[in-house]
Structures are given as structure tokens and as C-alpha cells.
């Protein structure tokens, strides 16, 4: 049994490494001992220990977002495995390749009342791209080949488009302590090679590219819409395509188009503020929209695309079905960057810029100027955090943005810059849970990293801070503390004053300083924007974990947002009125 266990788990772990999985997040447990010990002994694999499985899974998810390579998750049997579910749901919808390894009791101990034994078969349901319940360890050569093959298959399926989590259930009998030495690695490597997986990027046939180009070229009023998409080379390719087609790009903050050295002439970063005015939005209806990536954060954009059924929406996606408007006319199954390059190869550049694209860029300049000019100079305002961070963050930094209000403020107030910055968030299922853990996982490969997060989301994942202490991570957390769920103040529920605070505002009146210090972090509460800038700069220069709490008022925050949106609407309406009643692009 000892040889069977040692050789089998060693073959599986070595197969993972050979298939490109070189990072693992392990939570302690008895039944997972063989996997944990084999991973610890493998020279080609780096592992991070994380005690709480729920936090561990989000930590691994953040690692994958930053590294853009599959990461393995390892836990023991029972409810430990169930705690992975929220992060696996997020990984599924945000297309993050996780290789989830859950240790299990052997088949004879299932469904008979054995301790720490739950039904782990298909535990994650449709949120796992692929599931396998491994055979019990054997020391025969065919079974060692089987173990290596299953490892390679898991890694390949996780990384294949659309990427996502896979679940490998690993039943193990006692005794659980393997003997892992150099002889074991030599044995499993001589028995069989790990299958080599060759994969390419999805491309369209030339005739389909030509047909698509003719549709785009025929449009008088074209737009490109880019949601969350983090792909090397895409920014350069799509901005070149925008210039060639003379199509403005409505760029979500997670599209990676707002920051960097690429051409941003056609990048529209204030479209959310522009489209909030329905009268203005109704004058800006395009003929065609070419959409890349996930659906953007902006609700006005979503409603605009859904309401104007005359818009021909073309969704480019190499897998899955991402069209919540239910109005897409065409789906293009292609790698996004490859398609841009294919179109550029045959495109005929427009002879001159159209009034359509010029008007969009002029409106964007107006909106941006209004927002900047009317930001409060002294008072705390949550949106201003992003304009400040855009100045404070060094080139190459990563900004991780929490859900609810932070990501929406990033959409409005994170303006285009030539400084290379990477913007990440958990926008698959859009939950407020696990954000601290995800950001700290990303910080392993993306330093320096700044997380902007709300107080309820921070509270939800406080125990995720332990990772910073255990692994010596560098992260700056800007805690937007409005004492409750700030986003609900913008929703219809806010009109019901009686039950609102109890049901939706949910103030906690918590002071987080002692909790942060317990995890070895520094805590600061600035009283002025000057102090805020000082604490952020100090944290970036010092390293370690720092939490900077910005205390705001939910009521004042809503008032300032609405004031700014109204000012933008007024100035845009005035601008369009000066152009006359007929649209200049008709």
C-alpha cells in the first residue's frame, strides 16, 4: 500500500507540474496528507498554506487572475470541500482556471455514516467544467500512467477556452503518509510521460472575416464596447482597429484599455456618465456595436443596448454565451486579439474622422472635465479616491477593486492614463465575499497592489488578512467605510425610510483597527486628502499590509454623485444643442 500511495500521488502531482500547474494553495487536513506531502516535496511546485478553505479558494482565484496560469487547490474531505463553492462559482463565471483537488474517503466509507464523509461527487454541480472521481491508488504502471494523464487532462480542460474550474475528487485509504523521495520521482517519470497538450487560439476562416469586415465598414455609426478582458496584446490590437474603423471604444475599467502606452485617442472612459441621461443617450444610438469581453459594469450602457433593438450587436467570444441584453445579432467564436489582427489585415482605413467619432470624443472630454472640476477639494467623497490613486500608484501597479460601489466609482472616476496600471476585480458573480482573499492572492504576483473595498465586503472576508501575515505579502487596502451598504442608497429601496436602515443600510458601527493589527497590519484613518496621499505613499514605500480607512457619509455620497451626474448631463445637452437639432452624423 505504501508504494501504491506514494507512487500514485507522486505521478499525479508530477503530471500537474509537467502540464504547467506550478502553484498550489493547500489547506491543512488529514485525508489530503498524501497530496500535500507530494506537493511540498516537488521541486517544480510552489505552495502556499491557507487555513480557511473558503478564503483559500478566493486566494487561489486571485493568484490565477494575476499570473494567468492554472493554480491547484487542495483540501481534506467533508465540509472543507464545501467551503470552496463560492470561489468556484466566481471562477466559473469569470473564467478562471482552477484545478480543485478534494481528498475523499474510499468508496466503502461513503454513505455509511463514516466521519467527515459527505457526498463529494459532482459537489460543485455545473460550476465545474469537468469532474472526475479518481480511482484508488495502485502501483501498477497502467495506473501510474492513468494518474499522470488525469492530471494533464484536468489542467488542459481548466485552461481551455472558456477557462474555468475543474474538480478532481481523490479517494484515499489509510495509511495516509506517503514516502516521497528522489527514488519515487525517478520511478514515476520512467513509467510514463505526461501527455503533451497542444492548443491554439480560435480563428475565423478568411471568408467569415471578410464578411464581418464588410458589415463593420458599412456602418455610419459604429462603436466598440470592451468589458472585462485581460489578454496580452489586445489593447494595442483593438485600439488600432478602432482608429482604422473610426469607431469609438466604450472601455470598461477592467478592459485594460484605460491605462498604458497604447493609443487612447478613441477610448471613451466617461460613457457611463454620458449615458445616464436618457435624452442624450437616445441621440447617440449606433448602427453596429462590436463587443469584446464580459458585459461592462455600467447599467446605463446595458439598458441602452437592450432598449435600442435597432443596434446590430456583434459579440466576440471564444466560448460561452455572454449576452444579457438578449439582443445580439451575431456571435463570433474567435480569440479577441486574433480577430482584431485578422480584420486589420484586410481593413481599408477611413479617409477622415467622422462627425460621429469626433462627437463622442468631444463629449468624453466634456464629461471628464466636469467630473474633475466639481470633485470636492476638501470633503471626503468616495469617487475621488480613484482620481487620487491614479496619480499615486507607480507604473506597473495593480488596482484591485471591490464590488458594489467601488467598481462603479472606478467606472466613473478612473480616467484614461498613459501610466501602465492593471485593474482587476471579481466580476463573474459580482459578490462582495472573498474580495480581500482574492486581492491578497493576486499580490503574490502583482506588486505593488492596492485594493479598494467597502466596509461590509471587508468585514465579510476579514480572516483573509491572515494570508498577508503568513506569507509576508505587500498590499495597501483602502477601506471605504460608509457604515453599511452604500449602493442601496442609490436604489428604489432607499425611498422606504422605515425599514431601509434595518434591511438594507445594515450599519455595523465596527472599528477595524484592532482586527487589522491582530493580523500584523498597519492601520490609519486620514482626516484630510493630504493625509490620505501621505499614508498611501508610505504604504507603497514601506511594504507589508496597510489598511487606510476613508470614512464617508452614505447620504452625502449619494448627493455628490447625483450632483456630478446632473452637471455632466447639463453640459452634454448644451454641447449637443449647439450642434443643432439634426445629428451631424446623419
Curated annotation (Swiss-Prot):
Is this entry keyworded Signal?
Answer: no
Subunit structure, interactors included: Homodimer.
* GO molecular function (one): 2-succinyl-5-enolpyruvyl-6-hydroxy-3-cyclohexene-1-carboxylic-acid synthase activity
Listed name of the protein: 2-succinyl-5-enolpyruvyl-6-hydroxy-3-cyclohexene-1-carboxylate synthase
Q: What is the reaction catalyzed?
A: isochorismate + 2-oxoglutarate + H(+) = 5-enolpyruvoyl-6-hydroxy-2-succinyl-cyclohex-3-ene-1-carboxylate + CO2
**Gene3D superfamilies hit by this protein:** 3.40.50.970, TPP-binding domain (3.40.50.1220)
Q: Which GO terms describe its biological process?
A: menaquinone biosynthetic process
Biological role stated in the UniProt entry:
Catalyzes the thiamine diphosphate-dependent decarboxylation of 2-oxoglutarate and the subsequent addition of the resulting succinic semialdehyde-thiamine pyrophosphate anion to isochorismate to yield 2-succinyl-5-enolpyruvyl-6-hydroxy-3-cyclohexene-1-carboxylate (SEPHCHC).
The entry's free-text remark on the cofactor is:
Binds 1 thiamine pyrophosphate per subunit.
Species of provenance: Geobacillus thermodenitrificans (strain NG80-2)
Task: Tell me what gene encodes this.
Answer: menD
Q: Which InterPro entries match?
A: DHS-like_NAD/FAD-binding_dom, MenaQ_synth_MenD, MenD_middle, THDP-binding, Thiamin_PyroP_enz_TPP-bd_dom, TPP_enzyme_TPP-bd
Keyword annotations for this protein, in alphabetical order, are: Magnesium, Manganese, Menaquinone biosynthesis, Metal-binding, Thiamine pyrophosphate, Transferase
